[in-house]
Amino acid sequence: MISSASGTNWNRPDSFKGTQCRNIIIHGYCKFENEGCQFNHGNSKETEGQTTDEVPTQRSMTPLNVKFNAKTSSSFTPGKSPAVRSPDFSSLPAFQPGAPVNDQPMLADGPQISGTMSPSLMNSNATAFAPSFNPYASESFTPSVSAGGIPSSQELAGTLHGSNPSIPSPVPSNPYVNSAGLPSGGMLGVGHPMQGLPPPPPPGALPVNPITQFPTVYPPTHSVLQYHLYAPDPPPHLKIPLKPNERTPETLFINNHLRDRLVKNNQTALQVFPRGSLPDIVGDYFGLVPMDFHNRTSDKKRYNGHKNSLYKVFSNLDGKIYFMRRIHDVKITDSAQVSKPFQTWSHLRSANITVLKDSFVTSAFNDSSLCMVFDYYPQSQSLYETYGLANSVNELNQEYLWAFLVQLTIALQEVHSNGLALNDLDWKKVIVTGEPGRIKVTDIGVYDTLNYHQEGRMLHTEQQQNYLSLAELLLNLVQRLCGASGPLDDVKSYHIDPLFKKCIQYLQDTSNNNKNIEDFTKLFSHKVLSVVNSLQYNSEYLEQQLSRELENARLFRLMCKLNAIYGRLESRIDINWAESGEKFPIILFFDYVFHQKDDTGKNVMDLTHVLRCLNKLDAGVSERLMLVTPDEMNCIIISYKELKDLIDSTFRALTQ
């Protein structure tokens, strides 16, 4: 320790009190501080007063309510010499680029920054010790309205609580355009509101929008990369021909397009939203999710002037997902009006008709609503939504028209053969459920329920009207295919297959009141063969993809069984799991499969080895393998069949 008093007189004048003690600079402290050392040790209030008095004062403003504490601030960044006490700059406002120095607000009884800074401030490390306000880390940051369009604290609070959702929150690209003051009621507690944007975040930090810090009512979007980390196949013109023994990652897994479609179907089926004013339970169903967002008033004609709503619901009976059509404010006094049409339509089974699962009247919506429940198909859209909207990008060609015609004819044949009629046949009531162009007629039985007591209904007349409705549906699709907007009944003006025109003309013929499915299908019987061939090819493709996943499901069950019995707490004190126990081979086999190491002790990640061992274990082959302990002092020779029996018996004992 260097004594500051060596070679000096302890009774010297106080002229050395402004000189920094060398012990503080070298060692960080001075043991003679309380024994008469006359030099400055950084804790003298007089020194602080002298430091701040070096800056002349010219004007003042309202003093701060709360002083900045650099020790408790998350934005405090100490310099290289933490022992050296720096001047207190906590009372100074944050410097804003682009603003004149003379226009910076001054503090009462404090320093004022003039056009020329004092040498003492220029020489001190102000950058390392000057505190900076970080609005992104402060929970009390409340911006007010400025010229840049930033909402005030009251408006922002109203937006976050849903009271004023119409207030936008734009963020200017240049945060230095507006002059910034001090935040209102924030960390520094200044009485006047902020007149601009806060300082930018530190380099490397991502700016955070205050609104995004609060949870939203809608679930987050999902990325496909969460489910498959392999790169997609290149375009067909960039593919390199492979040898018979070569494989690509896609050949080891399910097709990317099919996997993506199935994953999105699962996401759509399990997606829920806040129920809002909807009831918790309606009949035997819960978790109502609105599905129809189009709000078309023209649909009232289809339901005898009643409004309708569409919901996705979860069944309390079997746990499956269905969709429910609600007809608002239906006055039904006769129970047969609901039960009879349901019994008639619920037994229909066709590949192109959605199954009617339930029909009931409920007052859960504070009115008398008719609810009809059907099978649910995720991501399905009507023909109108798929091809009829102006912004639709789905491809429509002549082959799709033939496929739609064949499938709708199958649906009509099933309905007419059961003595019924599709009175609601429209392209808004036909949904596309999958590829290639698979469709289903939905909302069956609704018309018969609403018009149960209508007199003068003739089944033959209604069935003949179905052919006219089918012609109108097909002409709507033809219009979208040809890009024309002419009258629907003028089929001759469209450039399509002449045979397809002939089919539509047969459906539109009002002079023929005895149209039937048998005569109609004779017009395009050879087209039915091509549609059947396409659907059969698609079914074989799906079966091939499913056969690949069969192995994954089998091995997944086996891995679940292994992990259920391996590494349990009770096995640590059970003698059967010791090296001399009968279950010790399970531990060695688990390490042999998943914890492989090479000769140098490096971990080996060999998926082929894992699949080979698990396949042999699942099959229970008689092949023997040698399992060695980690210390290589003991080994066990055992067959896969014996291992399988041992694992099965252990798992059964665990589940009993």
Swiss-Prot record:
A zinc finger (C3H1-type) spans 15-44. It comes from the Eukaryota. Residues 565-656 are annotated as: Knob domain. GO terms for molecular function: ATP binding; poly(A) binding; protein kinase activity; zinc ion binding. The keyword Zinc applies. A motif (PABPC-interacting motif-2 (PAM-2)) lies at residues 128-148. GO terms for cellular component: P-body; PAN complex. Keywords: ATP-binding, Coiled coil, Cytoplasm, Metal-binding, mRNA processing, Nucleotide-binding, Zinc, Zinc-finger. Belongs to the protein kinase superfamily. PAN3 family. Regulatory subunit of the poly(A)-nuclease (PAN) deadenylation complex, one of two cytoplasmic mRNA deadenylases involved in mRNA turnover. PAN specifically shortens poly(A) tails of RNA and the activity is stimulated by poly(A)-binding protein PAB1. PAN deadenylation is followed by rapid degradation of the shortened mRNA tails by the CCR4-NOT complex. Deadenylated mRNAs are then degraded by two alternative mechanisms, namely exosome-mediated 3'-5' exonucleolytic degradation, or deadenylation-dependent mRNA decaping and subsequent 5'-3' exonucleolytic degradation by XRN1. The N-terminal zinc finger binds to poly(A) RNA. Contains a pseudokinase domain. The protein kinase domain is predicted to be catalytically inactive because some of the residues important for catalytic activity are substituted and it lacks the equivalent of the binding site for a peptide substrate. However, it has retained an ATP-binding site and ATP-binding is required for mRNA degradation, stimulating the activity of the PAN2 nuclease in vitro. This is PAN2-PAN3 deadenylation complex subunit PAN3. It comes from Kluyveromyces lactis (strain ATCC 8585 / CBS 2359 / DSM 70799 / NBRC 1267 / NRRL Y-1140 / WM37) (Yeast). The gene is PAN3.
